[in-house]
């Protein structure tokens, strides 16, 4: 047998020198805070790479969007079918301050609403709030049986659907355009707009399961830190200088 270098033995030694670095050792944990319009403020935790050189951790966090169940934010299982989007606008210490970014229904809830023998009516409205947030609201409604109705189906005529849709857009426009984004959020949680639509369309055709199924944020105004801190119930730091009143004494030179 020829004596020579055994290639198989030398191959195994290369991997021993490599050290595996845990990627989580370079990351920091930040708390995500929801606005004060919701009952539960602590949304959860998020990870980000630590600030190194020109890469700032705060810049990586700003703009992150979190999708949270409204049931967790309100501590109420009745809101489990609605999802709220929260966007990180500011980082203070280890806290990420978020703002409302949108609302949506779970797909299983939407599928459960659509049934036979009834008409589905949808409407969408683009509206601007008083604090210059441009939103698009999508509403959904279904017809229901009139009292003492024997007929199985509850199909509405085209003229009735148009009248209901017109009423829906008017109510959404009125309710959303007359308030700020935070005030609109407080209206969306208990479904004030849906109940208002249901009540006002009784004369045209009785409705059921009337919801604002989706809210889409199209455009935000220029970022205002003071407004965000007020939304989170935190006092703003006063950066303006105070007027200092001091007696002015003119120095007189005795010798020139």
Swiss-Prot record:
Give the record's keywords alphabetically: Acetylation, Cytoplasm, Ribonucleoprotein, Ribosomal protein
- Which compartments is it annotated to reside in? Cytoplasm
Region feature Disordered, mapped onto this chain? 1-20
Which regions are flagged for Basic residues bias? 1-18
Q: Which GO terms describe its biological process?
A: translation
For this protein, the record's Pfam families field holds: Ribosomal_S3Ae
Q: Which residues carry this modification: N-acetylalanine?
A: 2
Q: Which molecular function term from Gene Ontology is one that the record holds?
A: structural constituent of ribosome
Cellular component terms (Gene Ontology): cytosolic small ribosomal subunit
Per the record, the domain of life is Eukaryota
The record's HAMAP family line, in alphabetical order, gives: Ribosomal_eS1_euk (MF_03122)
> What quaternary structure, including any partners, is listed in this protein's UniProt entry?
Component of the small ribosomal subunit. Mature ribosomes consist of a small (40S) and a large (60S) subunit. The 40S subunit contains about 33 different proteins and 1 molecule of RNA (18S). The 60S subunit contains about 49 different proteins and 3 molecules of RNA (25S, 5.8S and 5S).
Q: Indicate the family of this protein.
A: Belongs to the eukaryotic ribosomal protein eS1 family.
Protein's recorded name:
Small ribosomal subunit protein eS1
Native organism: Talaromyces stipitatus (strain ATCC 10500 / CBS 375.48 / QM 6759 / NRRL 1006) (Penicillium stipitatum)
The lineage, from the top, is: Eukaryota, Fungi, Dikarya, Ascomycota, Pezizomycotina
Gene expressing this chain: rps1
């Amino acid at each position: 047998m020829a004596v020579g270098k055994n290639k198989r033995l030398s191959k195994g030694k290369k991997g021993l020198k490599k050290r595996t670095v845990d990627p989580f050792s370079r990351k920091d944990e930040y708390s995500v805070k929801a606005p004060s319009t919701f009952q539960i403020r602590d949304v959860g935790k998020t990870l980000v790479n630590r600030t190194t050189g020109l890469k700032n951790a705060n810049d990586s966090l700003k703009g992150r969007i979190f999708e949270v169940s409204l049931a967790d934010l309100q501590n109420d299982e009745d809101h489990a079918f609605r999802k709220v989007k929260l966007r990180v606008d500011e980082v203070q210490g280890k806290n990420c301050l978020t703002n409302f970014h949108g609302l949506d229904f779970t797909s299983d809830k939407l599928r459960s609403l659509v049934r036979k023998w009834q008409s589905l009516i949808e409407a969408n409205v683009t509206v601007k709030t008083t604090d210059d947030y441009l939103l698009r609201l999508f509403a959904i409604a279904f017809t229901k049986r009139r009292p003492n109705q024997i007929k199985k189906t509850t199909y509405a005529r085209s003229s009735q659907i148009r009248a209901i849709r017109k009423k829906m857009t008017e109510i959404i426009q009125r309710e959303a355009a007359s308030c700020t984004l935070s005030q609109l959020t407080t209206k969306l949680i208990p479904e004030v707009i849906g109940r208002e639509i249901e009540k006002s369309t009784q004369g045209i055709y009785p409705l059921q399961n009337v919801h604002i199924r989706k809210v889409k944020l199209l455009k935000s105004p220029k970022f205002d830190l003071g407004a965000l801190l007020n939304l989170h119930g935190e006092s703003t730091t006063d950066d303006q200088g105070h007027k200092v009143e001091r007696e002015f004494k003119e120095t007189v030179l005795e010798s020139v």
